[in-house]
Amino acid sequence: MPSIRAACVAAVLLSPTIQAGEVPVWFGTYTTPKTASEGIYVALFDTDTGMLSKPLLAGRAKNPSFLASHPRLPMLYAVAEIAGNDGKPGGVVEAFEIDEATGILASRSAESTGGAGPCHVTVDPEGRVVLAANYGGGSVACLRLTADGWLEPLVMTGSASGFVQHEWDRSGEPGIDLKRQDKPHAHSVDVSPGGFSVFTCDLGLDRIQVHGLDRERATLNPVRDSVRLAPGAGPRHLAIHPDGERAWCVNELNLTVTGLRSSVRPGFLVDETCSTLPPEVTDRTGLSCAEIAVHPHGKFVYASNRGHDSLAMFRIVGDTTHLEFLGTEPTRAKTPRHFAIAPGGKFLLVAGQASNTVTVFAIDPETGRLRFTGTSIEVPSPVCVAFRRSPGT
């Protein structure tokens, strides 16, 4: 059998060179159980025309279910959503160097996240630390980056700890989903625009936990604030407005979006909550929300509905958190676990986990409505769409 090195060399030789107007886009996947995926895939996307090339295997990885790029360096980070590694409990985050001519990835370092099932990863705006949310473990990890963007080991004890375990305190509480909310389940982690706070959506706790972040020491402090949402909401992902003063949380279990505004405290104040589905959808059995994003121009919000297989479209009303529901657009992809808005804000790409496809939509800059472009490519079990970040974002 050919070696992994030989396979990587062959992939580079077969990879088309990135042309003007094209940007690489990576797709995180599930490799187990029983999928055809071998890791992270890359395609070339034309930000002017919306054309998407056939994907290639960019880097072998196990369950790279979420990806995040460095704000300055050609580095991509992926969680390995697993319960343990090499006989040790806890998942892994892996650092890959990007070949800027092709988008092919080379593994550079990998470290434990200290908890089972990491499902989300992010990099702070200055590119000094990587943070991961451990869904199975109900915890958050902060790992320091070297000057080259490689990962340093997680420190879990003492004053320099970069690890926080969420605590369970909901026994007997009415209104919660006993199957999904049996313990803490950290589902995403985001850094405030200033880089001093970390927001973790915990689906099991129905809270957004706010931790202080020391990027110099790569440490997290215990909970500084806790934003409580409705019982049974199941907060999953957070999208922060470009102004840094507003945010919206997509709630997986009750299929809603909650508006949040900044407060004098480190966290947010809760404003109104609205549905991601039209009122005529009364039977929501088997349906759930997944991803949320604010358009880079700051005028629209989008959220994905699994089972209904649609994207909810909203217009942001003025300088408030109020959302005007514009309707839903079919994703033409089954189980839209994730989507991302392409650089320039003209197109949106949807990952259909169950259909093994990625579909492309054009965004109307005036109304925010989506239009299917007709472009769809095959990617095995896609669950994340990632572009390179702009510096400082």
Task: Give the predicted meaning of each segment.
Residues 34-37, 61-71, 114-125, 166-196, ...:
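Beta-rich, blade/repeat-based domains predominating
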Residues 53-123, 127:
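Blade-loop segments of beta-propeller domains
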Residues 44-50, 96-103, 143-154, 212-219, ...:
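Short loop/turn segments immediately following beta-strands, especially the blade-tip
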